[in-house]
Amino acid sequence: MPTLTSYFGFLLAALTITSVLFIGLNKIRLI
């Protein structure tokens, strides 16, 4: 099912970007 795979890939990418932004904001706030 290519639709399910593409949806899962998009969800994984969104989660990764959110985690990176969250960690980046925490580091900036720490400094």
UniProtKB/Swiss-Prot annotation:
Some GO term, biological process aspect, for this entry: which one?
photosynthesis
Give the keywords, sorted. Chloroplast, Electron transport, Membrane, Photosynthesis, Plastid, Thylakoid, Transmembrane, Transmembrane helix, Transport
Q: Does the keyword RNA-binding apply?
A: no
From the Swiss-Prot or TrEMBL record, state where the protein is found. Answer: Plastid, Chloroplast thylakoid membrane
* The keyword Transmembrane helix appears for this protein: yes
Which Pfam families would you find in this protein's record? PetL (PF05115)
Report TM segments: 4-24
Instruction: Provide the Gene Ontology terms for cellular component.
Output: chloroplast thylakoid membrane; cytochrome b6f complex
GO MF, any single term: electron transporter, transferring electrons within cytochrome b6/f complex of photosystem II activity
Family per record: Belongs to the PetL family.
Question: What does the record give as the function of this protein?
Answer: Component of the cytochrome b6-f complex, which mediates electron transfer between photosystem II (PSII) and photosystem I (PSI), cyclic electron flow around PSI, and state transitions. PetL is important for photoautotrophic growth as well as for electron transfer efficiency and stability of the cytochrome b6-f complex.
Q: What is this protein identified as?
A: Cytochrome b6-f complex subunit 6
